[in-house]
Amino acid sequence: MLCSLSLVLCGLLAGTRADPGGLLRLGMDIMNHEVQSAMEESHILEKMAAEASNPQPGGKAIKGLSNMKVKDVLEPVITLNFVPGVGISQCVSTGMTITGKSFTGGNMEINVVLNITATDRLLQDEEAGTPVFRSEGCEVILVSVKTNLPNNKAINKFVDSTLRKVLPGLMCPAIDAVLEYVNKKWAKLTDPMPVDKMGTVKYALTSPPATTASHIQVDFSPVVQLQEGQLIQLATDGSLPEFPEGSAKDSQLLLSATFLTAELALLQKSLEVKLKDKRVGKLPQNTRTLAGFIPQVAKTYHKPKPLLIKVKINKPPKVTMKAGKSLMHLHGSLEMFAARRHGKHPKSLFRLETHIGLEIHYSVQDNRLQMVTSMDSLLSLARESSSVGDFHEAELTGFITDYLQKAYIPVVNDVLHVGLPLPDLLAINYNLAELDIVEDALVLGLKTE
């Protein structure tokens, strides 16, 4: 008994698209789940039936009907279809029993099955910048009517008149109420969300949502801001990221590598550390171990001195992505010191310019994007200064790589543990998402269960 009518969530087609940092596709799976959830969680049909059964003082009475009650509301059946350039057609089928005393003086009982139609538009709220649904109309179509009253012309006219007066006022406000319930699930979308205490991320819309034959698409131009107020601009070079081919009907969130790069810029200062009292395997971190790679160190330090290492990150971390693999690039310097007694400042042995490549492993926990890194490679190592004479940096590659893996990577992962916020909309459970690394982007396949 499903109908062809439509609750329309109209997405305005975007014009010239700016370079988005994120793309969201809402397929029929998510939309079905959200509309059904709004109907169930709001209990709106039951509430409307209760209100109809308890009219307010001063309410307009229906001629020929008294003591009206509405009961036995059937669970609604909802079917959705996308309408390109318009929105979503929705069919809501339900039924109920209307009782009362008719003009004949007897008890009346009408069992009715109906479809509700409405046209609603998905707009972008000018003030908040969030999507918002607005209803433009509503109709109630009768599918079947059964009554305990005699079957004659006068009774049939009375039943028809009663239903035409009761049903629109009962069902159409219910549809509006469901839309309001859904609107609340968009309300926090553009609120700034913290990244530890370093800054915030705000998912601003690039343009109003667009509707195709298979999905609604929302383009994001995220605003990344340091705690002090400085905005971090997303890089505009490179091609626009795209969803994988053949996934047009799936609900997906795409986060570009440039957006993730901007977010990690919030954490740059936290990645600069001083390390000491560390071991690489069985090797103690002292000048005697270092002398095995740079013999000149043994001439200066006859007795072993503890080593201190300072890691400085000179550029914001950069994220790159190829199919199946993502790297975090850290450009900076690594300076090694020998500790000295009696409160003296450590002695700088050398400073190396470094380019570190860390492989990123993604997951979602508590609806935040989590990153865990592991050492991929030491992409470059160049001597900037040295107090222990000349040496070949290449001879230190293995030692430095092992040290970074054992001592520095845990620090990086501890910093990343804060997680990166994901768009807060429609109560989407990102913990269920399937993650896929594609060219220049991370794609989250969204699930409802």
UniProtKB/Swiss-Prot annotation:
Glycosylation sites (chain numbering): 115
Disulfide cross-links: 138-172
Assigned keywords, A-Z: Disulfide bond, Glycoprotein, Secreted, Signal
Residues of the signal peptide: 1-18
Keyword Signal: yes
Main location: secreted
GO CC, alphabetical: extracellular region
Domain of life: Eukaryota
Record family assignment: Belongs to the BPI/LBP/Plunc superfamily. BPI/LBP family.
Identification of the protein by name: BPI fold-containing family B member 6
Lineage: Eukaryota, Metazoa, Chordata, Craniata, Vertebrata
